[in-house]
Amino acid sequence: MSRVLVVGAGLTGSLCAALLRKEITAPLYLGLWDKGGDIGGRMITASSPHNPRCTADLGAQYITCSPHYVKEHQNFYEELLAHGILKPLTSPIEGMKGKEGDCNFVAPQGFSSVIKYYLKKSGAEVSLKHCVTQIHLKDNKWEVSTDTGSAEQFDLVILTMPAPQILELQGDIVNLISERQREQLKSVSYSSRYALGLFYEVGMKIGVPWSCRYLSSHPCICFISIDNKKRNIESSECGPSVVIQTTVPFGVQHLEASEADVQKLMIQQLETILPGLPQPVATICHKWTYSQVTSSVSDRPGQMTLHLKPFLVCGGDGFTHSNFNGCISSALSVMKVLKRYI
């Protein structure tokens, strides 16, 4: 039985795992490792520690799909819509700049439900808090080691973490990356920002006419979401959840600051925009070091093959463009090259 490892439990990784299970009919062990404590990557959904049913999307807020991708990725959208994983965005967003023909979608159960759906389809054995540090070539297999010192061997490895984290890996992989590939990986750049989820008491109302609001000139906050309102899941059993995301300059300026200090600043700034908000019952602050791809690999190949036999390939939106469709395109590119060589 072939052993396959996918590194990264975001959209690209989970979709690669699901497509592998679908496309490869031979017996297959499929493992998926992520260094974080939860699945989702940049589509993570946080839960209130007081009520797990009260959730907030700390990463992706909604999906925008152009007419081109509505057609190109039609099967993926139809499947997710049919299962209720995605639904059309119907609540008002103040300051949103859309293009004619664009469709917008939200995930009623939070965007991590998309990842959970694909992981369930894949049947992968998911291991969290598995931070890959080394990849060695041994006996025509990949020996993958973590920061705890544990190591396992695989016949095929797919890396879907951000490009800077690929370049940090040690072992034989260092010499397998060509100079051109190294320069391409170094050319990928990301924006950084913070997100803060705030959970409020049951019965509290936030009296604004919008579900989300973009702020064009605020020095700290660029986006506010009344998250349960955005997803159209307002309930008498859950209090409202609010997500605020910072501007990129603020994120860069405070990248090394403590999350507690950043959270305090963000709440102070929120009070100037929405005065009168009561104290939340719980808060969750998240630093996005790699928030969105601002510059991807040139020509956007969708993947980067580092070794053929055994197969080692990189995927992710750093090889396409930074959004939902970029991740789908990358997963499809990875599968295309895999089917060609295995």
UniProtKB/Swiss-Prot annotation:
Its EC number is 1.6.3.5. Disulfide bonds: none annotated. One of its GO terms (biological process) is norepinephrine metabolic process. Keywords: FAD, Flavoprotein, NAD, NADP, Oxidoreductase, Secreted, Signal. GO terms for molecular function: oxidoreductase activity; oxidoreductase activity, acting on NAD(P)H. Expressed predominantly in kidney and testis with lower levels in liver, heart and embryo and weak expression in brain and skeletal muscle. One of its GO terms (cellular component) is extracellular region. Pfam families: Amino_oxidase, NAD_binding_8. The keyword Transferase does not apply. Coiled coil: none annotated. Residues 1-17 form the signal peptide. Catalyzes the oxidation of the less abundant 1,2-dihydro-beta-NAD(P) and 1,6-dihydro-beta-NAD(P) to form beta-NAD(P)(+). The enzyme hormone is secreted by the kidney, and circulates in blood and modulates cardiac function and systemic blood pressure. Lowers blood pressure in vivo by decreasing cardiac contractility and heart rate and preventing a compensatory increase in peripheral vascular tone, suggesting a causal link to the increased plasma catecholamine and heightened cardiovascular risk. This is Renalase. It comes from Mus musculus (Mouse). The lineage of its organism: Eukaryota, Metazoa, Chordata, Craniata, Vertebrata.
